[in-house]
Amino acid sequence: MQKLTLPAPAKLNLWLHIIGRRADGYHELETVFQFLDHGDELSFALRDDGVIRLHTEIEAVPHDSNLIVRAARMLQAQSGTTLGADIWLTKVLPMGGGIGGGSSDAATTLLALAHLWQLDWDEDRLAALGLSLGADVPVFVRGHAAFAQGVGEQLTPVDPIEPWYVVLVPQVSVSTVEIFSHPQLTRDSLPLKMRPVPEGNSRNDCQPVVEQNYPEVRNALNSLGKFTEARLTGTGSCVFGAFPSKAEADKVLALLSATQTGFVAKGSNVSMLHRKLQSLVKKSSA
C-alpha cells in the first residue's frame, strides 16, 4: 500500500479530577476519555528518500514543531527506517479546544506510518513513544474509551454509554499551562476507590478556573446548560452536553446557532481511527 487516508478523532473528558501534584510539576489526574465520531483527516504517501513533509493550510505552528512532523521523525529515528512520507492534514478540530486535536493527529501519524512503513511495532511500543509527545497521545493510539490515571497515560478500558453530544466551540484558545499553574485550581480531589469507575462523576476540576478567566467559555456553558448538563472537556475551551438522539442534539444546536458555534457528534468507545484500521486489516487478509 503506497497511500493511506485515516481520521484523527476528537475526544472528550467525561469528567476530570486533579488528585495531586508531582515533584516534577505535572499533575496527577483521574479522568474518563471517550471518542467522538468527528475529527481531522490525514493522508499519507510513501517516500523512499527519507523526507517527512507536512502539507497543510494551518500556519499557526512551525513545520518542524508540529506534533505530526515530530511524531513521524521520532518513529523514523526509533525504528531505523530509511523511508519517509508526504502527509496532508485536513484540519477540522480547533486548537486549544480540549478535544485532543494535536494529540490525535500525532497518534494517527504513528499508527499510519507504522502500517505504511511495515514496521513490526505493537500498540504498547507506539503508545510509549506517543507519551513522549504528549500525555493524551497514548489513549488515541490505544483507541478505546478509558479510565486514565497518572498524567493521563495509565489507561484502563471502560465502556460508558455512547450518547449524541452537542459540542460548543468558543472562539478562544485556552492555555493548558495557564490553567494548570493557576493558584485557584483544585488539586486535592480524593482518588476514586470504586471499580468499575462510576459513571456519575460529573465534575471537571479545571472548569471553575476556566469559567473565571474565559467569559466566552462561561457563556457557552450557560447557553448549553439551559438544555442539559454542560461540562468543560480537558482545560477547554470546548464544552459539551449529552443527548439521547441525534435529532434532539441537532435541535439544540440549531437553537444555539445564533450565538454559539459547534457541532453534533456520536460518542464512541472504539475510535473511528481504530475501526478504519480494523477494516483495512480485514481487507488485506481477505
UniProtKB/Swiss-Prot annotation:
GO function term, MF aspect, one: ATP binding
Active-site residues, as the UniProt record annotates them: 11, 136
EC id: 2.7.1.148
Leader sequence segment: none
Gene3D superfamilies for the chain: 3.30.230.10, GHMP kinase, C-terminal domain
Pathway where it operates: Isoprenoid biosynthesis; isopentenyl diphosphate biosynthesis via DXP pathway; isopentenyl diphosphate from 1-deoxy-D-xylulose 5-phosphate: step 3/6
Role noted for this protein: Catalyzes the phosphorylation of the position 2 hydroxy group of 4-diphosphocytidyl-2C-methyl-D-erythritol.
Family that this chain belongs to: Belongs to the GHMP kinase family. IspE subfamily.
NCBIfam families per record: ispE
Protein name: 4-diphosphocytidyl-2-C-methyl-D-erythritol kinase
Organism field: Pseudomonas putida (strain ATCC 47054 / DSM 6125 / CFBP 8728 / NCIMB 11950 / KT2440)
Gene assigned in the entry: ispE
